[in-house]
């Protein structure tokens, strides 16, 4: 049976380190790290995410500001708000909760955030720094950064000689995850919906990362014996065993099957998810240090 990787415990240790770092910064400079979270519309899942981010920011001792805008907000109005946050020296991190309502050009909004305040790591500049191997001066997308910390907890910092397969090529996760693994010297294969003979590709992986958004797609026989499996999927499915109309969260990996074969595996929930918010806090305290001319902490 695989070791179940405890994302909650790792996230708690990261947020405690962030809290101490924020405390020391405030003691020295008299400045709290400032995080502004912007949400548009009424999507309940987005509101739940934003509330947990704002709550965690307060626990870390940040100046946490939430802007909740109505569904009918215009592109121009949102761009104006981002512009104001860009020039506000008390705000070190800006996060616009995605997905935005359909009438928005999300990319224009995201790219309008100053790269040094882009704590989601989605600006072209931050993505480019990661792609060129600069892990020191940019901000790295939170979910891959968190997943990578879990990988390093199992394998250490140097992944030389290990094969890694990432299923999923999104800008939000797949591409930056591939870059992080590559920067740690893994041999990386990027797989996706058009990959030929996906099962065979996956079976080569010492580190298998699934981020496709399809419940239990990765079966036990896709997993190389002794592999580390990182499950980034969050899928809500019906759970009649819990009662009529009930649902549960599952990942992209068939957990019971895969955990019989793998050496280590992340659960859903409680694996990569908690790491995402922890790394958002880490990025915010890093951005605050840089803004104040201080050497940023490492996590």
From Swiss-Prot:
Signal sequence annotation: none
UniProt key word Amino-acid biosynthesis: yes
EC number: 1.5.1.5, 3.5.4.9
Entry GO MF terms: methenyltetrahydrofolate cyclohydrolase activity; methylenetetrahydrofolate dehydrogenase (NADP+) activity
SUPFAM superfamilies membership: Aminoacid dehydrogenase-like, N-terminal domain (SSF53223), NAD(P)-binding Rossmann-fold domains (SSF51735)
UniProt cross-references to PANTHER family, sorted A to Z: C-1-TETRAHYDROFOLATE SYNTHASE, CYTOPLASMIC, C-1-TETRAHYDROFOLATE SYNTHASE, CYTOPLASMIC-RELATED
Subunit relationships: Homodimer.
Name used for this protein in its record: Bifunctional protein FolD
Protein's organism: Agrobacterium fabrum (strain C58 / ATCC 33970) (Agrobacterium tumefaciens (strain C58))
